[in-house]
């Protein structure tokens, strides 16, 4: 079999009949599959062993040759080659067709490639292929031209002859009438009626004669006229006319029906001439004609440049895929389950064999044509069932799955088997919390670990002598003997495992942990890892995977350990934050209660304070004074203060002061709880002497994450977690019904506002308010009432209330929920998203009335349905984003560009003071400067140089110096040919360091945007206000709209050019007229609705691109008017706005990566002297290269315009046909790719995953492929501190050893011959340790 590492590119093209025969190992002649008596494949059938190989390894069909020693022999009795049965997955067969058939992809695909090439409408083509019309394939024009005068003469003579005969017959009939009349008169019966009857009858007969001859003349004229103008490609549906023409002039032309006609046309088709003619048409034509010529030229050019043969679109031979890919399985009841393909192949073979027989029998043409049509339909069904006409169905009317269906869709070969493989060495189980686990550890159930590490355990058991061989070791493992567990402990030590929770929405959904053996059957997960996995313990399951090779383990340990993945790649904030119980415990510790036991007491040391606490003399939350040593880092702005003493002893002061002593130590006022809390933070971190609810804690952890190494951050987080869990029970927080305190004035508030609501309703009744105004006033009224009740609820919750502690600490819940429990539920929305003006006046403590319950549930249920829909919609968005950006990899260190984006770093408030912009951490942060930053104070001093990174400290420093804008590098301005460069991308937000070459930043970007997708709303909100614009799309639909580059709903117009605005109201609405500054341009009128809020006033002067009314702007118009950079920036800002409105932080650089891919292509307008075609969509790099080549050769460069493509379109337009085919529209992509003989360079991730190669990202990059790992003792000891690798005094069986227990005399050195003077002791030094081997061997 072909090794994937032996090729760098993959080409797809059209297979000719010879190619198919070369692939094949034999012709399938019979429709039989297997013999139902012997259950063996039938000879020459669809499963024949002679063609496809033996069904059993190393055994022929008749059993004459068995065993591997006969490898390669072909049995002379049964004709089967002795080889492995797996060849039945690779070997192909073929069917020789009795009549050619067209390939349905090229005929029926949209657009029809056959139709374009031959310039025939698909309808007409269908008539020819399915035997409803004849097609002229060849005309001997020279001979016809030469013989035409003679033929004309012959035709004229024949016509004259016919006319002569016609006239003679009529004349004869006329004479007979005269004779009959004379006879009547002679007999004396000359009545008028009899004569009239006779005359009428004669006239009718003469008219019939005339008609008969006229029809013959007409038919002859029609045949001759048709023949005179006949040219190749002409079609004729009139069978009689065709036969007449064939009988008379068959020597001058050839023609037939079906695929045979198409084949002949394709064989004679002159591609060069067609290309030349089409190019002329493009140069001279306009409109539809030019557009069609362009499309045709694309197809003609494809054949010209690739060497594909057009006639390969018509098949004489069809391939039969290997039998193991279309298996037949025996079921329990003796019946067989078979792949649909076997039925489809069977239909083809049956019809083909029948056709062959009819041809041999010399059956009439009509029968043959019918059989050929049926064969064509059978092959169509095999290739793409249902593409034309009714699909072929199996039992229970289910359409059979054709070859195309096996590739298409989620269950197709691409997505099911190539991109979604099953993995060995994996398991899955329910997860439970492991509060005692460190961040980098996970608990693995013993039975699961034993199964996963089985091969390792077996090897170790044999190595350590517990078993003689593998077989007995396996028995030990199966019995789970006691020694097995000890060996398992040893094997799993330092061997990381990967844990994954579905859905894996971002890269933190798979992380590495060190396994710890645990009892039971559940996986134990450290609590700090839950946020990254979005895991909870209500029955969630997780999968475990085992990295096997040393490289895989090293990669898992260095890149994927949970303790290293502390920052979220989407925004750079910490993802491993203490939560819930931990926060409660830490909040309790850092809270100081005034008047607590022991307040104001002074201690000479921490130890003394601890002793006092143990003896219950002071409270954990009491403010005491403790003398701290000089190396203690105090808060930045600490100044000595005073502490009031509770219950001072007689004669003692009632106030104690903080002070600093001459030896540097300080008497510091804090609580013992805060001392404990600070004990978990790094030693040199400033003392945190304040309460630490969730928000404060988050800031502390973020700060530590930016200032300290990952190992220190992980240690701090573990310490915080342990302390939080330990102290949470000490707080004694639990909450009961009595903790829910309802404000006593609640009823008063409700009565007061009910009165006001009655007044509003009265005003409405008497006509003073409209329905819309009444509704708005009621909504405003009850919103005010709810907020007042909420304030009252908050006032009545004192700081000691358990419910208040839970909420204030940030452990769980918020005041809004408390208000619903203890205050009033307030206004609720209906399923449309409109606010119902009737409020829910009760709270959950009192209980809701039936009506209140109903209106509450109505909207709530819609919310649940929405969530389910949103998940699917968001998943699909993520899939498209991944597909469009999967080949964006950091390919080089620096692209060398001097370009960048201008970004705001400071903004001024109302007083004019400069502050850091709100979204600094999502914009300029983590980028590199594209230009030096000059101090605005003197205009000379360089504050920071180009290439410096913008950290938060640098940004704050810039604002302090009065800098408002900087020019920073961006993915949008990167000039790398493929992917992006490290300097334009900036820092990796997951590490806060410059991104590594090889980082798959495209996929990280797609995950960062897609992962929070489910949090976005699905609705398009109706504002409910009077002066608002129409419904503005928000949430997920808006993000989709932007990334798909669609024209937004309720589009806001922008000024096409600079000019003066005139706003005027009309009968139907309002219109904005833009009068240009340049008189040569016509003014433009924009109709807008009266409700739309205007952004310009009458008489304003506006610049090109100015938005005229509120709403969403079409990015395609921005691209046309203001250029690509403005369009890119607009999309980035709009997407960011949507996410920020939902409280989701995403760094702009992720959105930029996607937008960069959307504007990667250029539409060629004028091809100049390049090989590009007008109207063709080409990659920027290819466009640039073609132009440079043209200029170099002194030619004219091509002209083009940038094209904004939606992510779906951009994914399908990718250079990689493998990637595009595995995304959507598989058959269309493969048809197009085969026609153009596309080559896949295998530069992206998907295409390498599909063919089973290492992905060209991370350590899979070519530059890292042959890296060798050198052990470094110092580093090794820091990474594996508990492993005993070279550590002092370790007794680990894997550590350094003195080798004294090794018996060198029994070592088998294979082919290595030892000298007679060989002495094992030469290898040991005086202490029994190993010496330098030198040249001993």
Swiss-Prot record:
Question: Which GO MF terms are attached to this record?
Answer: DNA binding; DNA-directed RNA polymerase activity; magnesium ion binding; zinc ion binding
What gene is this protein a product of? rpoC
**One Pfam family per UniProt:** RNA_pol_Rpb1_1
- The signal peptide annotation in the UniProt record is none
Q: What GO biological process terms are annotated to this protein in UniProt? A: DNA-templated transcription
Name by which UniProt lists this protein: DNA-directed RNA polymerase subunit beta'
Summarize the protein's role.
Answer: DNA-dependent RNA polymerase catalyzes the transcription of DNA into RNA using the four ribonucleoside triphosphates as substrates.
Residues noted as binding Mg(2+) in the record, renumbered to the chain: 536, 538, 540
Organism per entry? Bifidobacterium adolescentis (strain ATCC 15703 / DSM 20083 / NCTC 11814 / E194a)
């Amino acid at each position: 079999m072909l090794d994937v590492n032996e090729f760098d590119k993959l080409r797809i093209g059209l297979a000719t009949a010879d190619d198919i025969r070369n692939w094949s190992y034999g012709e399938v002649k019979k429709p039989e599959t297997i013999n139902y008596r012997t259950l063996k494949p039938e000879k020459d059938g669809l499963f024949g062993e002679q063609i496809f190989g033996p069904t059993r390894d190393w055994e022929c069909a008749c059993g004459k040759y068995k065993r591997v020693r006969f490898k390669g022999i072909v049995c002379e009795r049964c004709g089967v080659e002795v080889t492995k049965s797996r060849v039945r997955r690779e070997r192909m067969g073929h069917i020789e067709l009795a009549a050619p058939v067209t390939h349905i992809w090229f005929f029926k695909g949209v657009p029809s490639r056959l139709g374009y090439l031959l310039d025939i409408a698909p309808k007409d083509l269908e008539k020819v292929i399915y035997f409803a019309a004849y097609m002229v394939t060849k005309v001997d024009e020279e001979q016809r031209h030469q013989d035409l005068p003679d033929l004309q003469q012959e035709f004229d003579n024949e016509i004259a002859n016919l006319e002569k005969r016609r006239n003679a017959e009529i004349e004869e009939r006329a004479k007979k009438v005269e004779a009959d009349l004379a006879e009547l008169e002679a007999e004396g019966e000359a009545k008028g009626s009899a004569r009239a009857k006779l005359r009428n009858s004669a006239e009718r007969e003469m008219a019939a004669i005339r008609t008969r001859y006229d029809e013959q003349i007409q038919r002859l004229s029609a045949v001759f006229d048709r023949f005179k103008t006949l040219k190749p490609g002409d079609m004729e549906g009139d069978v009689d006319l065709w036969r007449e023409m064939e009988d008379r002039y068959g020597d001058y032309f050839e023609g037939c029906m079906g695929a045979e006609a198409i084949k002949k046309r394709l064989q004679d088709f002159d591609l060069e001439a067609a290309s030349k003619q089409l190019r002329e048409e493009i140069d001279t034509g306009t409109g539809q004609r030019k557009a069609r010529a362009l499309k045709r030229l694309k197809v003609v050019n494809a054949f010209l440049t690739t060497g594909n043969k057009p006639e390969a679109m018509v098949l004489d031979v069809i391939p039969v895929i290997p039998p193991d890919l279309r298996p037949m399985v025996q079921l329990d009841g003796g019946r067989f389950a078979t792949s649909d393909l076997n039925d489809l192949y069977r239909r083809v073979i049956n019809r083909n064999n029948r056709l062959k027989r009819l041809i041999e029998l010399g059956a009439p043409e009509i029968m043959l044509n019918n059989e050929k049509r049926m064969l064509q339909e059978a092959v169509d069904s095999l290739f793409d069932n249902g593409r034309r006409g009714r699909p072929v169905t199996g039992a229970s009317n289910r359409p059979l799955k054709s070859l195309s269906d096996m590739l298409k869709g989620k269950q197709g070969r691409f997505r099911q088997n190539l991109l979604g493989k099953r993995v060995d060495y994996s398991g899955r189980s329910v997860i439970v919390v492991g509060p005692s686990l460190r961040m980098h550890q996970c608990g693995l159930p013993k039975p699961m670990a034993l199964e996963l590490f089985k091969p390792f355990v077996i090897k170790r058991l044999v190595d350590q002598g517990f078993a003689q061989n593998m077989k007995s070791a396996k028995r030990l493992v199966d019995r789970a003997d006691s020694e097995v567990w000890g060996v398992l402990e040893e094997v799993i030590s330092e061997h990381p495992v990967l844990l994954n929770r579905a859905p894996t929405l971002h890269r933190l959904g798979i992380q590495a942990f060190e396994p710890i053996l645990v009892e039971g059957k559940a996986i134990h997960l450290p609590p700090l890892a839950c946020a990254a996995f979005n895991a909870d313990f209500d029955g969630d399951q997780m999968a475990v995977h085992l990295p096997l090779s040393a490289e895989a383990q090293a990669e898992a340990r260095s890149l994927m350990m949970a303790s290293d993945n502390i920052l979220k790649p989407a925004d750079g904030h910490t993802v491993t934050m203490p939560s819930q119980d931990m926060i409660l415990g830490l909040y309790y510790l850092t809270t100081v209660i005034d008047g607590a036991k022991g307040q104001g007491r002074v201690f000479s040391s921490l130890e003394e304070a601890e002793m006092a606490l143990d003896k219950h003399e002071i409270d954990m939350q009491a403010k005491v004074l403790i003398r701290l040593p000089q190396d203690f880092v105090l808060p930045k702005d600490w100044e000595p203060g005073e502490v009031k003493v509770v219950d001072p002893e007689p004669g003692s002061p009632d106030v104690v002061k903080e002070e600093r002593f001459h030896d540097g130590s300080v008497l510091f006022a804090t609580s013992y709880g805060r001392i404990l809390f600070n004990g978990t933070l790094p030693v040199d971190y400033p003392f945190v002497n304040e309460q630490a609810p969730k928000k404060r804690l988050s800031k502390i952890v973020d700060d530590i994450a930016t200032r300290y190494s990952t190992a220190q951050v992980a240690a701090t987080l573990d310490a915080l977690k342990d302390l939080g869990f330990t102290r949470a029970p000490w707080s004694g927080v639990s909450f009961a019904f009595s903790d829910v305190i309802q404000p006593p004035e609640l009823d008063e508030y409700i009565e007061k506002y009910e009165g006001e609501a009655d007044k509003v309703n009265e005003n409405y009744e008497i006509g003073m308010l409209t329905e819309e105004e009444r509704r708005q006033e009621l909504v405003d009224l009850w919103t005010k009432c709810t907020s007042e009740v909420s304030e009252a609820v908050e006032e009545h919750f004192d700081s000691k209330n358990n419910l208040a502690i839970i909420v204030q600490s940030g452990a769980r819940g918020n005041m809004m929920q408390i208000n619903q429990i203890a205050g009033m539920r307030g206004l609720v929305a209906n399923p449309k998203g409109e606010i119902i003006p009737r409020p829910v006046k009760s709270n959950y403590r009192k209980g809701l009335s039936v009506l209140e319950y109903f209106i509450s549930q109505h909207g709530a249920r819609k919310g649940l349905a929405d969530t389910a829909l949103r998940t699917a919609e968001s998943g699909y968005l993520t899939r498209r984003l991944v597909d469009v950006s999967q080949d964006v990899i950091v390919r080089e260190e620096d692209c060398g560009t001097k370009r960048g984006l201008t970004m705001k770093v400071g903004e001024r408030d109302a007083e004019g003071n400069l502050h850091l912009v709100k979204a600094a951490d999502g914009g300029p942060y983590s980028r590199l400067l594209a230009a030096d930053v000059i101090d605005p104070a003197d205009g000379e001093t360089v504050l920071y140089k180009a290439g410096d990174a913008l950290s938060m400290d640098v940004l704050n420093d810039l604002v302090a110096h009065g800098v408002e804008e900087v020019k920073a590098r961006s993915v949008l301005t990167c000039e790398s040919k493929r992917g992006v460069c490290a300097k334009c991308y900036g820092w990796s937000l997951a590490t806060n360091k410059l991104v590594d070459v090889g980082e798959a930043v495209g996929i990280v970007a797609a995950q960062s945007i897609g992962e929070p997708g489910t949090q976005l709303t699905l609705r398009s909100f109706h504002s409910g206000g009077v002066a608002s614009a129409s419904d503005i799309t928000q949430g997920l639909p808006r993000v989709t709209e932007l990334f798909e580059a669609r024209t937004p709903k309720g589009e806001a117009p922008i000024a096409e050019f600079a000019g003066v605005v005139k706003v005027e109201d009309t009968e139907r609405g309002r219109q904005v007229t833009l009068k240009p500054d340049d008189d040569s341009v016509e003014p433009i009128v924009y109709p807008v609705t009266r409700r739309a809020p205007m952004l310009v006033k009458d008489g304003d002067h506006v610049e090109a691109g100015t938005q005229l009314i509120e709403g969403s702007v079409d990015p395609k118009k921005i691209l046309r008017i203001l250029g690509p950079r403005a369009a890119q920036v607009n999309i980035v800002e709009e997407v960011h706005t949507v996410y920020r409105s939902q409280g989701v932080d995403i760094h702009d650089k992720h959105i930029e990566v996607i937008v960069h891919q959307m504007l990667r292509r250029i539409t060629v307008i004028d091809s100049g002297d390049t090989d590009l075609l007008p109207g063709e969509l080409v990659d920027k790099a290819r466009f640039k290269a073609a132009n440079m080549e043209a200029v170099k050769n002194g030619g004219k460069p091509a002209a083009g315009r940038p094209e904004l493509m939606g992510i779906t379109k951009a994914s399908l337009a990718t250079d990689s046909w493998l990637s595009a085919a595995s995304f959507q529209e598989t058959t269309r992509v493969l048809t197009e790719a085969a026609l153009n003989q596309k080559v896949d360079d295998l530069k992206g991730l998907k295409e390498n995953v599909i063919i089973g190669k290492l992905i060209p990202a991370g350590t899979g990059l070519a530059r890292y492929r042959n890296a060798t790992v050198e052990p470094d003792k110092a580093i090794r000891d820091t990474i594996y501190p508990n492993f005993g690798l070279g550590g002092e005094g370790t007794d680990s069986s894997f550590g350094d050893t003195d080798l004294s227990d090794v018996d060198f005399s029994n070592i088998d050195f294979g082919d290595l011959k030892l000298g007679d003077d060989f002495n094992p002791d030469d290898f040991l030094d005086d202490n029994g340790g190993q010496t330098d081997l030198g040249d001993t061997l």
